[in-house]
Amino acid sequence: MNNIKDLDFEELLNNPNFHYNLILKHEKIVKKFDEIITKYMIEDSECAEIIIGKYIYEKNQNRDEIYLPKSLTQNNKEEIIVKYIESENVNLRYLGMVINFPNKFKELNISDKIKLKAKGRYIQESNKIFKNSTGIETEVEVTYDKNQEEPVIYSVDKNICRVSVSRKWIEGNLDFNTLLNNFIYIFSFFDMQMRLSLVSNLSEIGSLERHVFLENSEHFYKISLAFRHKDIISKCQMYSYIEILEKHNIRIEEIIEWFFKYYLKDEFGIENFIVDMPTVNTSYLEKCKLIAIEIDKIIKQYQYYIQDGEIDEELLQISSNSIIFRNCMSIVNNKYVYPNSKVFDIASYLLFSAQSMMGYLPHIGIEYNEFYKLIIKEKVKLLDFENYQIGHIEWLIENKFIMEDKNGYLQFVNENKIYIFLDLYKNGVMSYWNCRKELRDEINILINENIVKFDNKLFTNDEQDYLNYHLNNSDFGNSLALRNRYVHGSQSNDDKLHKENYFIFLKIVIIIIVKINDDLCIKQIAEEKK
């Protein structure tokens, strides 16, 4: 490398087939030709994609580490990005990254003006692409049927997702307890383990969508098609439900205050929980400001109760710390179960992933997307599999997931273990105390084998991400950051938008209520089973 002259190196950079990644992955080359590389990068707007990608994508994503020249300043980087935004050939994905670029990197901070410029170009290019497109539209319809006996009916017809709720059920059960439970059992905000169903779930994202259409970076919340669909439905449910209740002179804010002031005291002996929801005549802008503060108060008070067994009003008044959801503790031990081993990763891939091709046996006319379905529904032997599959089968046998019966047919060794692995594969987490005893016993064995681990937080990891996406801007560049926006005064004058955001805030409060109630109920269950 010492023999390479500057002119020779510049000749390389001028080659039309040259790509910067060829040299930027070599730290020594970048260091030697630092200023030359900087000069050429400033003139090439496409280098913006390299610069942005360096910060957005992680080292563990099968990407080579990129080294930028030290002489490339913050201003240089912004200049290149502006040129990219103004250039003829722009990529919507990278424009999106600029718009949502997180302010957490010392080496690059994209200004709000540049982000706004990128947003304008993004809209312009999107309109060009989708102007004549024939995409599939999906509608959501939430209705309240006076004559319907079943509490809720979900159906899909010609790309219309319909949620039909029994108006008779709602109007016949107007006690506040049931009205809150409707978010669980009617609107399905939660599953039977009280895990939030509205989160962005990796198992709901197809391989093509994950690798082509979504930003594969921890700095962006994954807004998949499935997540958008659930989000739209939940918003429609919130709007319509609140409207129905108001016709019966019931405000959702009153139900929230009742939960903290009366329900917690009557059911769990928790006193002095202070929650003051916005009044009916308050503007939506002020409602958003007030409820953002109340959310912090709610979490702080519950954490004080966990720590001290009581809520200290004076401590609450002097506290100025912001709530960090990942630090919010549960009142019980062993609250959640998470995967924690290579054994889990390998077994789950072989058993449940369509990409493993383990359920594909075309020579005998059997095809299943997942191997575990093949074992459940068919009688197959080791000899029925292709050579490339047999090694994986032997691994599953060796690790006691499957076995051969006396006739040589493959079957599961322990169905409870398979159920746990499947649940964790699909949901990423299990609620230990909300599982039946046989599953808890099997989980205890897996804990001792270091295959899974316990966690003692109030919210699951996915729930923490969901809350942070909606409320804060610390974790995700594309977050709504509603709490930050209203607490710090950086909001618009759009009253319609404030109304939409207020309903999101209300949904967040309902989620927190269900999680707190579940936590306290689990404490009672755990104490009874000691």
PLM regions: where:
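Amphipathic, oligomerization/interface secondary-structure segments
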Residues: 315-530
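Long amphipathic alpha-helical coiled-coil/heptad-repeat bundle
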Residues: 1-284
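Short, amphipathic alpha-helical interface elements at domain boundaries
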Residues: 216-381
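Residue-identity detector for glutamine
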Residues: 25, 41, 54, 61, ...
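Intrinsic-disorder-associated interaction segments
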Residues: 22, 26, 41, 45, ...
